[in-house]
C-alpha cells in the first residue's frame, strides 16, 4: 500500500521515468519479484531514469538482482529493524541512502538491528520536534476526547459493545467539519463480527455516513461492496477531499503507518496500541485541512495560529470502560506530552 502511494507521489514530480514494482501488491506499472527479471528490466531501459518501488519484505530481491542503485529512499524506516527485514537493509548497496521515520527503533546491548547503528543507517541529518512542526503549520496538535461508558466489555459481547460505543461517540461529535473517522479495531475477528453481525452499517447509513473497512484477511469494502485496493484508496482520497462527505473507516493495523488518508478529523482507539502504532495512528488525523494548507502557503492565514484554521486539531477518542482502557488513556496522554510538549520522538527498541 505504501509503495503504491509513494509511487503516485513521486510520479507527479518526475513523470518521465520508468517504474518497476518489486512486491506482490496490485499496481498498474511493471511488477515482478524474480531477481532475473529485475536485472533484465534495468538493462532494457538504459536511456531512462528508473524508479523501483519495493517493500522491506522484498528488498533482498533487489540485492539479488545486482543492479546498481544510485539513491536508496527508505520510508517508515523503523520497520527495517525487524529480524526479517534487517538482512536486506544491511546488505543493500547504494551511492546514497536516506532513512525517514517519525518513530525510530533503536538497539540495546549487542543487538545491531537499531537505527542507532551508524554503519547501516548513518548519522542523523535532521530531526524536527513536533512543537516546531505545529508552529510552522506542518501539522496540528491532537486533542484527547474521553468517552466514558458503563458497559462491561468481554470477549463474548465485544462486537455489540464496540458498536454501541462507536455509535454513541459519533452521535456526540460536535464539529463544523463533516466528520471523517478512523476506527482502530481490537482485532480482525471483532471487527468482522461487528460489521456483519450487528446493525452498525445500517445505523451509520441512517446518520448520513458511508462505511469503509479494510483488513489483510477480508480485503477492502466500501459500504457492503467488496472492491480491490486501488478502487478503495481512490475512493478514500476522493471522499477525503470532499468536505460534504461523512464516512467511518474501520481497520486493524493496516492503515496505522505511513498511509496518507486525506481529510480525517477523528480517530477512535478501541484497543491498546503499541507506542509506535499509537503514535502513527495519531499521525493520521493531525494533517492540516486542505484549505488551511493552501491559505498558509498563500499567506492568507498565519502558520501556527490555530484560531484561524478551518480544522483546529485532530481528535483522538478513547472509550473508558475498564482498567485496561484507563491504561490506554494514560499511555496516550503520556505519549502526547512526550511528542507535542517535550518535543521528543516516540521511539522503541528492536528485539
Sequence positions of predicted segments:
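Conserved Walker A/P-loop ATP-binding site and its immediately adjacent core
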Residues: 1-12, 21, 26, 186-192
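Inter-Walker segment of RecA-like/P-loop motor cores
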Residues: 17-61
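Post-DEXD/H (motif II) to motif III coupling segment of the RecA-like Helicase ATP-binding lobe
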Residues: 79-139
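Conserved RecA-like ASCE ATPase "motif II neighborhood" in helicase/translocase motors
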Residues: 39-40, 48-88, 251-253
